[in-house]
Amino acid sequence: MSLATKERILDAAEGLFANHGFAATSLRQITAVAEVNLAAVNYHFGSKEALLTAVFERRVVPVNQERLRLLDGLEAEAAQGKAIQLEDVVRAFLLPAFNAVEGFGQQGAKFMQLVGRMHSETNEQLRAAFLKLFQPVGQRFVPVL
């Protein structure tokens, strides 16, 4: 299976999960939009839950990496005696997300819609998996505030 196949599955899932929610989206719908068979989804992701996690990881991991890079820079400046300003910490947290959503194009809007849906999902396991992606970043940012 090609990387393009995996990306088509992720794009299809992201859009459908954003529009209909996790529970209301079937793997059959995802395979139809992605133009792949069910075996391809199972091969790449194993389950619908793992697919949702991959959708989030694809967008959140690079954003979090950039957040931490910016925070590292602020902490390095602080080690040299420069005071860390609250504005700089907030910018280090928010700017990577804004830049990423803008860079994702139309898929960025879908992803933000999906993030909003995740906050109203009733499946606690999914909510916990989603929030777990942000926990390491939160643990680094909170002490600096």
Segments from the language model and where they lie:
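Hydrophobic alpha-helical connector segments
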Residues: 69-108
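Helix-turn-helix
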Residues: 8, 16, 20-50, 54-55
